Amino acid sequence: MFNPSLFKSLPALAGLILGIASMMTTPASADALKDELAPTGKLRVAIAISPAGGAFWSTKTESGGYAGVPVDLGKEMAAQLGVPVEYVAHNNSGQIVDAVSKGTWDVTFLPKDPEREGKMSFGPIYEVADATYIVKPGSAVTNFQTLDQAGIKVAAVNNTTTMRGAIAHLKNAKVTGYQTYDEIAGLLTSGEIDAFALSRDQLNAMSKKIPGTRVLDETFKQTVTAVAVPPNHPQALAFAARFLTEAITNGTLRKAYDSNGLKDTPIRTQTK
């Protein structure tokens, strides 16, 4: 015999079943996420080291640790995931890309371009940086036109988005890649190179340390920096994308900027 009261209770019963199922599957889902994003039990965050930190670059502290926006973001992401954080230091972003196939890191924050999008999976952009050039002390170069001349030697950090941008931009000057920021700074100081291509914020910091150098006013490329994970890690990408989106809106990213000497730097998530 049909019982109307039983029929009315079905939605509540269904909700109860779904709730129980959710409670049962959530731990398994969390374990699956950790297995994919932190397979060693730690969140291994790939960072690149330079003397001047920034939204992408990190620095090594006197105590032997690391500081920088990616360092702070990685620490917070690990806390949300519920695992310890471990930093995997590299000389530049190109080395981070080269290491993706070796499985030595789980997440990173680095500049992206079409070439890199074929090697790893990117989430949201959190920085847009203007790339330009700094010229050596005593240089007669004043703009891009006088820079792009035969015989002019321009340095860039090897295998980076900025290096590829400089090669595309300069038709006559020769662009050569070097492994480290420090090596290029030494060549610029000694006058062995004429210019160095990098983001404006990094070059402004460099100009204060190397007297006589000048940062050109023009911009040849906008470099976008985003969170990234190794390819074919859909759960890791979804978690990283959600984390960064929330970090942009809830003040976590702003706090990381402010704590790393970027209080006057606006957060830019879109190119012009």
Predicted regions and their residues:
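A ligand-binding cleft/hinge motif common to bilobed small-molecule-binding domains
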Residues: 94, 111-119, 165, 189-221
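Acidic, polar ligand-binding/catalytic clefts
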Residues: 75, 79, 84-148, 214
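Periplasmic-binding protein-like
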Residues: 128-138, 200, 204-245, 263-272
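Ligand-binding clefts/hinges and TM-proximal coupling segments of bilobed small-molecule sensing domains
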Residues: 32, 161-176, 215-216, 245-272
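Short helix-initiation/N-cap motifs at beta->coil->alpha
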Residues: 71, 86-98, 142, 176-186, ...
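Extracytoplasmic small-molecule ligand-binding "clamshell" domains
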Residues: 31-111
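Extended ligand-binding regions for polar small-molecule ligands
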Residues: 68-80, 145, 159-160, 204, ...
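Short loop->beta-strand "edge-of-pocket" segments that line small-molecule binding or catalytic clefts
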Residues: 41-49, 64-67, 145-159, 174
